[in-house]
Amino acid sequence: MALLFGIGYVLIIFEESLSFSKSGIALLMAVSLWVVRSIETSVEIVTLELQHATSEVSQIVFYMLGAMTIVEIIDAHQGFKLVTDCITSRKPKILLWVIGFATFFLSSVLDNLTSTIVMVSLLRRLIPPSEYRKLLGAVVVIAANAGGAWTPIGDVTTTMLWIHGHISTFSTIKNLFLPSAISLVVPLALMSLTSEVHGMGLNTPPTPLLAYDRSAPRGKLVFGVGFGALLFVPLFKSLTGLPPYMGILLGLGVIWILTDVIHYGDLERQHLKLPHALSRIDSQGALFFLGILLSMSSLDAAGILKVIANYLDAHIANVELIASIIGVVSAIIDNVPLVAATMGMYDLSTFPQDSEFWQLISFCAGTGGSMLITGSAAGVIFMSMEKVNFFWYFRKVSGFAFAGFTAGIMTYLAVHNFPL
């Protein structure tokens, strides 16, 4: 099973070179692994294991689909114009910091992918094609990953840990906000000294802001209700004790009815209604997560992940080092299966909820992907939108991202071990 998983994983890593869809590979890998598992063990046992795995995995997939649909309907109503309208500075250094922290806070309540799309689209309105715009785009990637690490709804990996009870809302925000902010501040400070930014104000005249399109009808209302629905999910979980996907489905139902009422009887606004938004969400991404998580659950059921955990415990006793290694590896390998594997390797009896280990896993897996452009969904979409290649990012940005990653870990350990 480990060999089969390894082959599938290599195919996923080189999906662009092979022109294969990683979603298709992940689904084939998941089914193949469970078939092998059924051959090794009785069908009755495997059926129970698969039912348990499907129950856990489906919660994450339902949550993702609900959140992506809400974000898509907000975007269709140009709700993010409220955010982009607030960014008016044209001074290079100020814009660098404004873009960074706007993305940081936006990503804390949205997924990294959507935050990156919104902010890179904004950059296209602010700045003509240049090295400076590429650098700002890289800032968006770092900020999106850092912003997603300190809230349960900001990144799919923190959401996975949260849904499975490894981290809680208040403790995550309290313990990871400062390290996440530091992991952004350090790269911003270093980038401010580069020639692309420092020399920009000396040699280039201010870039005029481009006009925005007029907002869709009731855009502010949809923005408020949609954002409120996303923010309500942690409160819903704490009030009812029900899993987060129920909260996101509640919000989805509310915004569905709202948009039906707003656009009732208007045939020219069908593209603003939720059924059309469902056709635009990243369903391939959801199926990829489904395949990966089912694959990891098969390895967990077979006891393979426990063997790896025992090996790490025997050779690397330091939990901080294990979490840091996972963060570095997440720059090369997708962080979703890494976190899924970690949850399978270590249960809550080994490391209880909100322990240092799970907090560090949340931080490291979230921010580690910034070190390479292919290490996160934010980096991949930036590469696609701005036609940035792997080696440009590696030369210009990876060092800054690594410095921020290291500083963030040191900040967490300092605060955790020496509380004020």
Swiss-Prot record:
Alphabetic keyword roster: Antiport, Ion transport, Membrane, Sodium, Sodium transport, Transmembrane, Transmembrane helix, Transport
Annotated InterPro entries: Cit_transptr-like_dom (IPR004680), NhaD-like (IPR045016)
Transmembrane segments: 25-45, 60-80, 94-114, 136-156, 173-193, 221-241, 242-262, 285-305, 321-341, 363-383, 400-420
GO molecular function: antiporter activity
Biological processes, Gene Ontology terms: sodium ion transport
Family (UniProt): Belongs to the NhaD Na(+)/H(+) (TC 2.A.62) antiporter family.
Protein name stated in the entry: Sodium/proton antiporter 2
